[in-house]
Amino acid sequence: TNKKLGGKVQCICVAYEGMERFFPADKIVMTGNPIRSVFVPCTQEMKEEGVKDYGLDPAKKHIFVVGGSLVSSKINQIMRKWISEGCPGSEGVDVLWQCGKYYKAGIDQFMAEETAKNPALKDTVRYSDFIGRMDLAYAAADVVISRSGASSVSELCAAHKAVVFIPSPNVAEDHQTHNAMALVRKDAAMIVKDADAMEKMMPTALELLRKPEKIASLEENAGKMALPDAARKIADEIYKLV
């Protein structure tokens, strides 16, 4: 649909470089994706608030696992496998996991069974079907694991977060991989292919967690790619046409 419309419209607002592959170059304007104003560079105050709100241990490092707006069953499967194996590599780490409303009942049962076998699990993994304050969850996290839909990528750049992207393969023209690679090429994110994620997702995030200089570099470079005024820029382009 986008390609068909691209030949008929006067202006095409995009969020990433390289869109000349899909649209006429003279129509492209780099605006970014509109996101809520709460997504700003994370501060220490925001981090402390997020850690408190989500019941995390302030003495630990934190990973936030989020599967996108519809929540990824694959990411949930990976989390269940990692937890059932005893959360390897999680010493000194808290994990906040958004599991999604659709999956919550099954995960409640799974977590009850796993906690009965390993009572320390409740001190390592916090999970919820829905995260109301994504800005604070991002702020609490030292590393985020996420799908790479357009809105998620824009939010994470605006928040200046270090992220391991797991692009969904179940999207048109593999656009989530293109979204993630736009950051990876600028050393602003890391990527694990969906096909490799079962074995590599958590080890990659946990390894990154032990590299504060790498995290700082990813955060800085992600921030450079943020386009926080996207809504205004798009509105300006619309006004030019009317």
Language model: regions and residue ranges:
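Donor-nucleotide binding loops and adjacent catalytic segments primarily
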Residues: 45-52, 56-144, 177-180, 185, ...
